[in-house]
Structure formats: C-alpha cells, structure tokens
C-alpha cells in the first residue's frame, strides 16, 4: 500500500515534466539545466557502480550523451510530503547502434526554489 501524497496532482505533473526535462538535458548536454535543478549535494550512482557528486556529474554531462536516442517508458511518480521518487525505464540506442535498456530512480525534495533532484541511481538491464 502506497503512502504517496499529492492531493490535487499538480506536484505529480511538475515532477513528470522535470523528469522529461532531465532526460532532454542529458540528450542535449544542457549543463545549465542541471546546475539549476540539481541540489548542491546531489549524488548519482551510475550504471557501472561509480558514484559522482554534482560537479563530477556536470563535467560528464558537458561531454554529451553516449546515446543517440533515449525513450522513456513506465514513468512512476510517488510523492511523500516534501520528497518524491521518480522511477522509469529508458530504452536507448548507442552511438554505435547498440540498443539497451536502463531503469532508474531519482529522488527529489521540494525546496523554496521548487523541486530539486538530490539523488539518482541508474541500472542497465537486459530485462524488458
């Protein structure tokens, strides 16, 4: 049983939009978008297990994506007061034509400046 809270659905809509913008920023190497929307203490666990802080993540993001296409599926947003989980599946095509799938969980907190991503974890998988 979920204890998610979002009485009018507006936060869910905002988080769904932010999730899509996060992916768009990834595909376009939009470091400024990330700089604005990631918490200062942001941390990501990459699909290879490496852990990056915000500065390291921004450096990697500036290099551009290693994929040419990334489509979202199964986006699930759950809100718990001033925290939220966004989980989704991404179907991607690499620059070399390879294809794959990843699943991720992003953790957001609501601040006076709006929702900020504080954590992300990515898992590449062969399961669909």
Q: What residue ranges belong to the model's regions?
A:
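A beta-strand edge to alpha-helix "cap/lid" segment located at domain peripheries
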Residues: 2-36, 41-128
